[in-house]
């Protein structure tokens, strides 16, 4: 499908390389051997101070890039030569954030530097294509510096982002360790497609989709749990103008950069943590006396008389003639039976170092988090290796490799009235016991059966139910960069993702309410499931940078991304094993066994172009365009462009920013930064199903004969959802960047939204998927 397209793109990229090299070559031949520019040498003086202490910083570097530089003395003072008093100076010092200072006509300046890792507009922001100071960005983007997140070692990233970034809603799924949160960036954009932001880790797409529902009720396998937050250096959230990611950028993007060596000297970090998780306060529920009154009223509404109700064993308070008195005259706190306080332990080791040829960062970690629900916990083993290589002055490379293994003991969650212990603890009659008791009031070690209302025993589900989730992922990439000339660079990244999820579940018959199947009543329930994902990803781009007269900066990029993904789900469910000691699927009745699953294979190609222009580091323009092809798109799509019989979505964007604080009329202002932003973009959502546009079939058995039947009605005109976004924003910082303010006004409109349209019953199906 993409062979011809790839060949054509390679030819186009080759032509661009040739033209750029020829341009540089011609420029070198026609230019004088030595540039001579008449520059008036002016001098700027000042002091560089620590923002916290006010003391001068020794050894700070003050420079006008490619022109002059100076180092501060013992008092933090400096002198630097500049051609005009309207330049931008760069101030760097070890252990501090880099700061860009516009002179705006001033001859003397005082600069206060904040410690490294402070979240401000001077920090480098990782955009989809490069890293640049936040002050120079044209889009609605936010950045947080985690730098290992040492203070919150057991959080998953999606939970850690809660309340950190404006416009990003992080809603926790539950209190189960590692289950994480649902992320929504500026609300919902689709009814049936995904609303998850695209996640990028070290330049490669990190798949956070779920390929098959869990067999453990209302549980979710969270890919973010496989990223140790102590391995994360910073996170950038791209809220708009994500068209550079084409049909995957409709919901914005979260760009994660993991930690790497910042210096060649060997550095060892070790952390060990123990956290106490306190049992939450119990929700107010009825006690035994109140529940009897409530139950009597409920039975009366069902038609029972007062005499019949008073004859029930739970209403008779006399032990004489009531052998079940001790069974029904208790005051059990069911919430205490299923919940407890717990401990969490976390151990982390990282070693960084290197030399002129290569630097590395190697980390290993182990974490054990016990849940507040009894018998639930999570064990995580993780390792990560990041390295950077200098093969030559022109040829460099990088490696980012990680492997994480996760084990969880779980229980059913949510409103599951038969098997969820938390729900049952809130609804179970408090006058009952969790254990069997005889007519003398002697309690047995055996757990009690279901009650007269057929309610399950929460203690049985805590102690005798089995629900395991084992999950691992390998995520790795290699990147190479070659400087073709002073202005022209070529780079390529290649990586793979491989993960596997295995689940096992057993629900005993004793003490648990029976389930009803289509052909039987199920007492014990057994199940196993395996989900696999394999994906390979590549991103190759050419980049051209040119600065003219120091004030005009031009950057352009042309690139090609390709991703192939293959997912599979297989499950088996069994019922009614002979005893509760037989817990695997093969021990269930053959006639009741259920098997199923699914497979999915899809390709994605993204051809992208980017052009940027900056004038005096105060006016910034950016234009992006992407052409996206996908095996998911139909053959009769009406929009986009067609290349070699394949339909491509064309998604452009444009953005502009004006840094008013760099203008001369704000030379005496107390405001450190004041920036206006405008952006417009078109983005796509390709979550329309792998085979929705095609005619598919499924096997079916009839009277012992196997055959094929239609699995749905194809929609060959089905295409991507298109989101049009407009954003206007302002960024302000004051008090030496200690106070920052960002406000955005945005409007989003989704076209060609995925919907299920009702059709006549004569087609054999009730709905069809359309735009």
Segments (PLM) and residue ranges:
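Short, acidic, small-residue-rich periplasmic hinge/interaction motif at the N-terminus
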Residues: 29-41, 47-53, 61, 92-96, ...
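Short, polar/charged loop or turn motifs at beta-strand boundaries
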Residues: 48-51, 137-163, 171-175, 183-190, ...
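Short, acidic Ser/Thr/Gly-rich low-complexity loop/linker segments typical of extracellular
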Residues: 68-77
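Short acidic/polar hinge/loop motifs at secondary-structure boundaries
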Residues: 79-81, 204-239
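N-terminal periplasmic accessory domains that precede
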Residues: 107-114, 130-135, 157-160, 183-186, ...
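A beta-strand signature from Gram-negative outer-membrane beta-barrel systems
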Residues: 109-112, 164-166, 229-269, 344-346, ...
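Surface-exposed loop/interface segments of Gram-negative outer-membrane beta-barrel transport/assembly proteins
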Residues: 119, 195, 263-330, 371-376, ...
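Extracytoplasmic beta-strand/coil segments of soluble accessory domains associated
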Residues: 159-208, 234, 243-262
